């Protein structure tokens, strides 16, 4: 019998069911899901509105190539467009966040005809070869070098160095408004504004990677809206199809015809079932004011995480329901103890516990998370 290759740490838990902000293991233990598959299930496990849309679609048709129109795709773009600022008129459909980053880079290369990509310390953009090339951490890259050579890394959140960083050879600048994997590090408004101005001056495109930050999690539909800085292209993914695989590059209207037939493609992009889920998710986001809910309950969670009373805790970082608790010690030692107390979390960087719960997490859930985090930190202090 074959087996699934192992390249993830295993926690010895078999998850069998999920509903909204909770999951259950095969022993009946319930967990508050603040992991959500790295942010994918922001709209909740088995959300009834998304389940209904998927059930309806699977009885009609599943996979149709992009050469043909489908009602599912048309419904998606109609709903998704309501979430976009006016400048963004073109959506490039993909299957994952890393693919979305790849196509954004391809657009920039085709438009500018320049070689160099600018990225930043502690960045994470994916694990395919292009997005891996602009990811900072060597542990992800070392085994696969040489990667794309024309990458220049600058210091994140250092606006006064931007003019030297972005050159006449720069095709694009790729940045996360809040670094996720790198430590839940929000960009400063001054930094993003400096990138916007210098990219414009040098004829480079500004790309915001919103795969983790986007679709309501930070308290706005798109994190860049909180900064008042618009990119030329932004990527999205994770929660956009309610838990099904999707990636998007969203671009200015004038980039809509940048590729000739054959210059880009994707077998599964625009899958009808995924499109049905994404249309339902987009409608739900708007009708239930998901960003507003994320802002309000996120403030409650941030306050709770900042009130552990532990000397191991440094500060709470992030926005909305994308939060990190920075510690004075390595964070990965707390994942298993939190699981034992019914809380699923994840790490970001070396010393940050990351919390990415669904938007419907309740005040009672926040209290449980607070109690669990407080307990594991206090216990660690005593050892």
Swiss-Prot record:
A cellular component term, taken from the record's GO annotations: cytoplasm
Record key words, sorted: Amino-acid biosynthesis, Aminotransferase, Arginine biosynthesis, Cytoplasm, Lysine biosynthesis, Pyridoxal phosphate, Transferase
Enzyme Commission number(s): 2.6.1.118, 2.6.1.124
Primary localization class, coarse: cytoplasm
Localization (cell): Cytoplasm
Cofactor note as given: Binds 1 pyridoxal phosphate per subunit.
Modification sites for N6-(pyridoxal phosphate)lysine: 238
Pfam families, per database record: Aminotran_3 (PF00202)
SUPFAM superfamilies membership: PLP-dependent transferases (SSF53383)
Catalytic EC class: transferase
Catalytic activity: [amino-group carrier protein]-C-terminal-gamma-(L-lysyl)-L-glutamate + 2-oxoglutarate = [amino-group carrier protein]-C-terminal-N-(1-carboxy-5-oxopentan-1-yl)-L-glutamine + L-glutamate; [amino-group carrier protein]-C-terminal-gamma-(L-ornithyl)-L-glutamate + 2-oxoglutarate = [amino-group carrier protein]-C-terminal-gamma-(L-glutamyl-5-semialdehyde)-L-glutamate + L-glutamate
GO BP terms, alphabetized: arginine biosynthetic process via ornithine; L-arginine biosynthetic process; lysine biosynthetic process via aminoadipic acid
PROSITE patterns for this protein: AA_TRANSFER_CLASS_3 (PS00600)
Biochemical pathway: Amino-acid biosynthesis; L-lysine biosynthesis via AAA pathway; L-lysine from L-alpha-aminoadipate (Thermus route): step 4/5; Amino-acid biosynthesis; L-arginine biosynthesis
Annotated positions binding pyridoxal 5'-phosphate: 97-98, 124, 209-212, 267
Residues in the signal sequence: none
Required cofactor(s): pyridoxal 5'-phosphate
Alphabetical list of InterPro entries matching this protein: Aminotrans_3, Aminotrans_3_PPA_site, Class-III_PLP-dep_AT, LysJ, PyrdxlP-dep_Trfase, PyrdxlP-dep_Trfase_major, PyrdxlP-dep_Trfase_small
Binding site for substrate: 127, 266
Subunit annotation: Homodimer.
The protein's role, per its UniProt record: Involved in both the arginine and lysine biosynthetic pathways.
Family that this chain belongs to: Belongs to the class-III pyridoxal-phosphate-dependent aminotransferase family. LysJ subfamily.
Protein known as: Putative [LysW]-aminoadipate semialdehyde/glutamate semialdehyde transaminase
Organism: Pyrobaculum aerophilum (strain ATCC 51768 / DSM 7523 / JCM 9630 / CIP 104966 / NBRC 100827 / IM2)
Gene: lysJ
